[in-house]
Amino acid sequence: PTETEWEYAARGGRDAAGNGNKFSGSNTLENVAIYSSNSGNQTSVVGSKQPNEIGIYDMSGNVWEWCNDWCDENYYAQHPSDKNSPTQNPQGTNSGTGRVVRGGSWNDVDFNCRSANRFGYGPEYRLNNYGFRVSRTK
């Protein structure tokens, strides 16, 4: 998915977007994620924790998920009231050295599993706590 699609899904869609949850589906990470405190240092079966508001599992924790967008650390730095701000109409940047990864993993602390958290890594970056989610846009 694009980073925008990923975040929309992680935050539970349009109806749940304003609920203030730090993690996908809850403010309590233990309810929805496999992360450093409960992972046993490995990935877990998909769906072993509660889904978010739209029924999607593991958007927080288990494995970092690659997004299609290039990562620009300053992309969201524009003021949100600016009509050209990416917070109003996110399209992603056209180039970069790394792709966006979201969601945190079994090897991460709670802060890294927040729905708002993002990092960028080169596509050659391969570890056992990275993966991807197949998605389709209608």
What are the functions of these language-model segments?
Residues A9, Y35, A116:
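Residues that scaffold the ATP/ADP-binding catalytic core of kinase and kinase-like folds
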Residues T4, I54, N128-F132:
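A structural signal for well-ordered alpha-helical segments within the folded catalytic domains
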